[in-house]
Amino acid sequence: MQQLQNIIETAFERRAEITPANADTVTREAVNQVIALLDSGALRVAEKIDGQWVTHQWLKKAVLLSFRINDNQVIEGAESRYFDKVPMKFANYDEARFQKEGFRVVPPAAVRQGAFIARNTVLMPSYVNIGAYVDEGTMVDTWATVGSCAQIGKNVHLSGGVGIGGVLEPLQANPTIIEDNCFIGARSEVVEGVIVEEGSVISMGVYIGQSTRIYDRETGEIHYGRVPAGSVVVSGNLPSKDGKYSLYCAVIVKKVDAKTRGKVGINELLRTID
């Protein structure tokens, strides 16, 4: 694996010179191997190590290099034709392979090659970009988008129209992460490398980026870039220091543990927020 990483790192330093016409065999094979490993879930752009999320930047570099070495090509679809550098994940799947990998794909869901979809996942008409990782038992609902390199945990529900931000550039930026057992309400957006920690519930229409204030009404604490585990979050506003105006924020209205979530439905958690 170290040799593969070295090839990617070296090629990335001269990426501006690389084109589909002049890409050498070693670089091309290394990039294709990484994309295949991401596609199968053997590698992932970010993973939790000793309780902390670690981003493997060299894998993002490989994804970026794939755009340098590949030319646009016609992609056949059921309703249309497309023209892009990245093939679709399921282009060569037959029924046996779908059965073996154990997930459902409802037309016209689109998944790019290099994204991993785990068993027991359901993809409604949605979009999953290259480098993303979608773990077991997750529902990606209608018109939801999982951006490039985003990491989605086990038993997550991404409701209709949810946007999970992608990140390829700037290179140092971390991917957006939704940990296990989270619920993201319809039309909400989580972007810019924000981490929604395990067991959190995000209400409909909540927008969270790195600069969004995440206000815990119980403690008065303000978080940035991280929704603490077990939070129930709704959209709100906080007043300015001079009291002349208010600005948007996300509000943690309560905390719940796994036992409570198991006994109480998501809708009930969001209804009883006073």
Curated annotation (Swiss-Prot):
Gene Ontology annotations of biological process type: diaminopimelate biosynthetic process; lysine biosynthetic process via diaminopimelate
Protein name: 2,3,4,5-tetrahydropyridine-2,6-dicarboxylate N-succinyltransferase
Location of the protein in the cell: Cytoplasm
Entries under SUPFAM superfamilies matching the protein: Trimeric LpxA-like enzymes
Pathway, per record: Amino-acid biosynthesis; L-lysine biosynthesis via DAP pathway; LL-2,6-diaminopimelate from (S)-tetrahydrodipicolinate (succinylase route): step 1/3
Transferase keyword on record: yes
Main location: cytoplasm
Catalytic activities: (S)-2,3,4,5-tetrahydrodipicolinate + succinyl-CoA + H2O = (S)-2-succinylamino-6-oxoheptanedioate + CoA
GO annotation, cellular component aspect: cytoplasm
Protein encoded by which gene: dapD
Family from the record: Belongs to the transferase hexapeptide repeat family.
EC numbers, comma separated: 2.3.1.117
Organism of provenance: Escherichia coli O1:K1 / APEC
UniProt-recorded Gene Ontology molecular function terms: 2,3,4,5-tetrahydropyridine-2,6-dicarboxylate N-succinyltransferase activity; nucleotidyltransferase activity
Subunit structure: Homotrimer.
Classification via CDD domains: LbH_THP_succinylT
UniProt-annotated binding residues for substrate: 104, 141
UniProt key word Membrane: no
Family annotation (InterPro entries): DapD_Trfase_Hexpep_rpt_fam (IPR005664), Hexapep (IPR001451), Hexapep_transf_CS (IPR018357), THP_succinylTrfase_dom1 (IPR023180), THP_succinylTrfase_N_sf (IPR037133), Trimer_LpxA-like_sf (IPR011004)
Gene3D superfamilies in the record: Hexapeptide repeat proteins, Tetrahydrodipicolinate-N-succinyltransferase, N-terminal domain
Keywords of the record: Acyltransferase, Amino-acid biosynthesis, Cytoplasm, Diaminopimelate biosynthesis, Lysine biosynthesis, Repeat, Transferase
Family matches, as PROSITE patterns: HEXAPEP_TRANSFERASES
